[in-house]
A protein has these predicted regions:
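Bacterial N-terminal signal peptides that target proteins for export
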Residues: 1-5
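Membrane-proximal alpha-helical signals and transmembrane carboxylates
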Residues: 6, 12-13, 17-408
Length: 408
């Protein structure tokens, strides 16, 4: 009995050892990967690594690609995992990709098709399912070299914050796993953030003001009017049909698309109030999930109702008549723009990135029946209409605030 206990103890101690484990200093932790088309080989891959000594606090920005201490390497190879193998030979450490925040494809690569990359990443299981996928309007290598986050955050934190800001707090289309599922389904599309470098300068004071409101401008990454040390920005979206990028859409189109998809959180808009003849600021937010009704036939009919809340943030609330007119105005404008976006997706992009396929699929008894339905073709001619219903809320606080001012 004592011999058995001793043998068991020896086995436990042996199996719980770390003889085959790698130490942290034997690894390089990847936080961003850029993929461009190569000149010598098929793939030009840019790897951005975390710098453990600069991973937090005020020194975090020392690890940014734009600094002298940047930990960024670019290699060309026949394939992405061949590039990883080459990199191992250069740095002498094992590359750990499980902490990667974002994978950035150049627009040229995305137009050629990134399906093979997505399938490879999913099969290899080296990346986490919630790794973000983006498309750069310039080369991915150039974009990664230009990032300069503010001094108080590390590069890892910057990617985490900026992607969460432009993405949804619900199921996110820009996650690697969601892109993979859409790709495998073959009946839907995908929409991911668009990034670029902004070379613009603030206009001269004599240039005059643009009279447009937020419903009249639709900027993409690289087009914002601003001045900052960090020239990179995330704005708008890349639309995919299958594994190929088929379009770029601006920030407003992206927001309205997410409202239709039920993935919109909240955002401030400055709009021209038709009744007050002035610019009015509101906080638009998704009141509840969109209500979708479907009718399957020779021409599939889909009706979408999108409930939104609008919080009036100007100093004084409007009258009841002005309020009703403003609600109708918001509902009407968003409905018109939403229907145009859907029609463009049907006829020009041929991409159901809204996820209508998921709603329809539940009506079929099994996958073969769904596949034989042929939604990828039927989507192009389907009768799809969206209606926005905007309700302005939160006037109690404003009214009580005005009353308190009057008493004083």
């Amino acid at each position: 009995m004592k011999k058995s206990a001793a043998l068991l103890t020896a086995l436990v101690l042996t199996l719980s050892g770390c003889g085959y484990a790698e130490e942290v200093n034997e690894k390089k932790f990847l936080i961003a990967l850029g993929i461009d088309e190569g000149t010598e080989y098929n793939v030009r891959a840019t790897f951005v690594f975390a710098n453990p000594s600069d991973s937090g606090g005020e020194e975090g920005a020392k690890g940014s690609p734009g600094s002298d201490k940047s930990d960024i390497l670019t290699v060309e190879a026949p394939g992405i995992f061949s590039a990883v193998k080459q990199l191992n030979r250069i740095i002498g450490k094992t590359i750990d990709m499980t902490h990667t925040k974002v994978i950035i494809f150049s627009g040229k690569t995305a137009k050629e098709g990134i399906g093979d990359y997505i399938y490879s990443f999913a099969a290899a299981r080296d990346f986490r399912p919630n790794t973000y996928v983006c498309v750069s309007r310039c080369s991915a290598e150039k974009y990664l070299h230009k990032i300069k986050p503010s001094n108080e955050i590390s590069l890892e934190k910057y990617f985490d914050l900026i992607m969460k800001k432009v993405s949804s707090d619900r199921i996110d289309e820009s996650y690697l796993y969601y892109f993979y599922f859409n790709l495998a389904d073959k009946t839907g599309g995908s929409i991911v953030p668009l990034v670029d470098i902004n070379a613009n300068k603030l206009p001269d004071s004599s240039a005059g003001k643009n009279a447009a409101d937020d419903f009249g401008i639709n900027p993409k990454a690289g087009e914002l009017v601003r001045k900052a040390e960090n020239k990179t920005e995330v704005c708008g979206s890349a639309v995919f049909s299958g594994g190929k990028m088929v379009a770029e859409i601006g920030a407003l189109s992206s927001d309205i698309s997410k409202m239709i998809m039920g993935e919109f959180s909240s955002e401030y808009f400055t709009l021209r109030n038709p009744s007050a003849q002035k610019l009015t600021s509101v906080l638009l937010s998704q009141r509840s999930a969109p209500r979708i009704k479907t009718e399957i036939g020779d021409i599939t009919k889909i009706r979408v109702t999108v409930p939104l809340n609008a919080k009036y943030v100007d100093s004084a609330p409007p009258s009841d008549a002005e309020l009703a007119e403003f609600e109708n105005y918001l509902s009407s404008v968003l409905s018109k723009k939403g229907n145009r976006i859907i029609k463009r997706a049907q006829t020009k992009y041929e991409s159901d990135y809204f996820g209508f396929n998921e709603k329809l699929r539940s009506s079929f008894i099994d996958i073969p029946a769904w596949n034989s339905f042929g939604w990828d073709e039927k989507f192009k001619t389907a009768d799809i209409k969206v209606k926005f219903i905007v309700q302005v809320t939160d006037f109690e606080e404003l009214n009580s605030g005005e009353a308190m001012k009057g008493e004083n």
